[in-house]
Curated annotation (Swiss-Prot):
This is Deoxyribose-phosphate aldolase. It is an enzyme of class 4 (lyase). The gene is deoC. Pathway: Carbohydrate degradation; 2-deoxy-D-ribose 1-phosphate degradation; D-glyceraldehyde 3-phosphate and acetaldehyde from 2-deoxy-alpha-D-ribose 1-phosphate: step 2/2. The active site is at 90 (proton donor/acceptor), 152 (schiff-base intermediate with acetaldehyde), 181 (proton donor/acceptor). PANTHER family: DEOXYRIBOSE-PHOSPHATE ALDOLASE.
Length: 217
């Protein structure tokens, strides 16, 4: 199994995050060789420069956290993020349109953003807390069709994060055709390891750095 550090997108998407906070995040990611840092779009260029001599990737978010921006806005955000050096894009679907049955709209939006990624990794945030099991299966199928690389459970701004059931349902639906990012819902190392066992390829939670230090000890 891959070392646990390579499952971690070290994240600070707080609206009050300062450059000092981002510096701290970056230095922790370098020290522990995490997979990536996940930060607001305005910090992408800054982080890319700070990480240029490391293997840590730069991830940012699009249409975040509510996902109801126009597709054209999300595409523009994506293009700018890629120009600024983003290696990975985490986009939020339009959950309302999806729940309304506008599947073609949702699929075409993901495809448009994937094209704007210009070869960079695309993760699709579906906000599992707001979906029924049947809806989760359907959106997983749409993400598979879109050409995206990952399906991601949550923004961290809804009432709950990932559950074991979410990960199991997504994995049973997509098999090896998509990678899975579990966001939130992880309270301890046992939870993180269970998410990985069920099929998660990346995980993130509010206290992930403390969990990582516990893992080292």
């Amino acid at each position: 199994m891959t070392e646990l550090n390579k499952y971690i997108d070290h994240t600070n998407l707080s609206p009050s995050a300062t450059s000092k906070d981002i510096d701290k995040l970056i230095q922790e990611a370098i020290k522990y060789d995490f997979k990536s840092v996940c930060i607001a779009p305005s910090y992408v260029k800054y982080a890319k420069e700070a990480l240029k001599n490391s293997d840590v990737l730069v991830c940012t978010v699009i249409g975040f956290p509510l996902g109801y921006n126009a597709t054209s806005v999300k595409v523009y955000e994506t293009k700018i993020a890629v120009e600024h050096g983003a290696d990975e894009i985490d986009m939020v679907i339009n959950v309302g349109r999806f729940k309304d049955g506008q599947y073609e709209y949702v699929l075409n939006e993901i495809k448009a953003i994937k094209e704007a990624c210009n070869g960079k990794t695309l993760k699709v945030i579906v906000e599992t807390a707001l979906l029924t099991k049947a809806e989760l299966i359907k959106i997983t199928e749409l993400v598979m069709q879109s050409g995206a690389d990952f399906i991601k459970t949550s923004t961290g701004f809804s009432y709950r994060g990932a559950s074991f059931e979410d990960i199991q349902t997504m994995k049973e639906t997509c098999g090896d055709k998509l990678l899975i990012k579990a966001s939130g819902g992880i309270k301890n190392l046992a939870d993180a390891q269970e998410m990985i066992r069920l099929g998660a390829n990346v995980w993130v939670c509010l206290n992930q750095f403390q969990l990582w230090k516990n893992y080292l000890n």
